[in-house]
């Protein structure tokens, strides 16, 4: 699925003696090339395993939820769907903010596996549109395995009476995991301007999922706002109360670490 995004916004100032070559953003940026090269066969294998397990569990749990469905559950199920979308949106923002703002690619294990894609994305925002389904969704599938496994265990071990009582809660958890699983796919669609399925553009236009115009706000350096990337519903209210800025001030005051220092380092790489 190919696409092109508008320029990622104003970028960090570079020294005057840097060449035009060093000022390029996108796939030819020195930092983007280095980060892309860190994607390893081992990482690919982990993503494949995560996707297969995740979607197997989704299918298993969905069948059980459908078999247990009753009309009288409808109001609580609707509430669970909305609540699941809201919680998923907040969690997507929390993870996105944490990975964008703190840590380093040099950290053991999580650096190359988890933080690396966030650094690459700010330098080359359209790289995500060149990622296939496995690379796009592998990490999110890994994260949602635990709640999906727990749900499958309950369906296998709990009595019908207990499952009847738990049904609204399990619908909430299932919706939360579905939105969580597809968050990066939704994020990819927000960067894709050509060839999107019609139903995806409808969901974006209705703001059921993250719209393309909405997400552009985040891609203005230094990438310090609008972190929620599932539905984007919480971005404006969190910005109004200065939620992320207050968290950053608190952490910087306690640790002395400067927000987005590693992100800026990669953005300024020229060779």
Curated annotation (Swiss-Prot):
GO terms for biological process: ether lipid biosynthetic process; fatty acid metabolic process. Changing residue 187 to A: Loss of plasmanylethanolamine desaturase activity. Does not affect endoplasmic reticulum membrane localization. Plasmanylethanolamine desaturase involved in plasmalogen biogenesis in the endoplasmic reticulum membrane. Plasmalogens are glycerophospholipids with a hydrocarbon chain linked by a vinyl ether bond at the glycerol sn-1 position, and are involved in antioxidative and signaling mechanisms. It catalyses: a 1-(1,2-saturated alkyl)-2-acyl-sn-glycero-3-phosphoethanolamine + 2 Fe(II)-[cytochrome b5] + O2 + 2 H(+) = a 1-O-(1Z-alkenyl)-2-acyl-sn-glycero-3-phosphoethanolamine + 2 Fe(III)-[cytochrome b5] + 2 H2O; a 1-O-hexadecyl-2-acyl-sn-glycero-3-phosphoethanolamine + 2 Fe(II)-[cytochrome b5] + O2 + 2 H(+) = a 1-O-(1Z-hexadecenyl)-2-acyl-sn-glycero-3-phosphoethanolamine + 2 Fe(III)-[cytochrome b5] + 2 H2O; a 1-O-octadecyl-2-acyl-sn-glycero-3-phosphoethanolamine + 2 Fe(II)-[cytochrome b5] + O2 + 2 H(+) = a 1-O-(1Z-octadecenyl)-2-acyl-sn-glycero-3-phosphoethanolamine + 2 Fe(III)-[cytochrome b5] + 2 H2O; a 1-O-(9Z-octadecenyl)-2-acyl-sn-glycero-3-phosphoethanolamine + 2 Fe(II)-[cytochrome b5] + O2 + 2 H(+) = a 1-O-(1Z,9Z-octadecadienyl)-2-acyl-sn-glycero-3-phosphoethanolamine + 2 Fe(III)-[cytochrome b5] + 2 H2O. It is found in: Endoplasmic reticulum membrane. The keyword Endoplasmic reticulum applies. The gene is Peds1. It comes from Mus musculus. It comes from the Eukaryota. This is Plasmanylethanolamine desaturase 1.
